[in-house]
């Protein structure tokens, strides 16, 4: 989960169009790919810059896609990016269990409902 600061609640209703909102570098996305991160949740409108001429470098790096027309064998099609999330300050940084509820659309994008659960420290 990437939560940007300041974490104002107004993020939930901001119109990001034509604002050149922050985004991830291709290198940052590649690092996450190489680190084995499967599900990226971010509170920005996109991991890529708003006007990138369709390059989508951060998306492609995260999914390890070299050519969208002919997918490479090692493309990470089981991974997801969820953009425009809001994580309230009450959710502290740390490890959580993620229930990522994804609509079963046959499309390259789908709405999702990520739910975080605290990991209980219990002794057996």
Model-derived segments and spans:
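Active-/binding-site microenvironments in catalytic and ligand-binding cores
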Residues: 1-124
């Amino acid at each position: 989960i990437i939560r940007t600061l300041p974490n104002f609640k107004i993020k939930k209703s901001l119109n990001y169009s034509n604002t050149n909102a922050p985004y991830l570098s291709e290198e940052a996305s590649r690092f996450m790919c190489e680190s084995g991160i499967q599900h990226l949740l971010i509170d920005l409108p996109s991991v890529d810059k708003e006007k990138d001429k369709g390059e989508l470098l951060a998306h492609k790096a995260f999914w390890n896609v070299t050519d969208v027309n002919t997918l490479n064998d090692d493309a990470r099609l089981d991974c997801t990016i969820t953009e425009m999330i809001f994580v309230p300050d009450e959710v502290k940084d740390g490890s959580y269990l993620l229930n990522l509820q994804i609509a079963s659309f046959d499309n390259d994008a789908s709405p999702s409902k990520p739910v975080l659960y605290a990991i209980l420290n219990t002794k057996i």
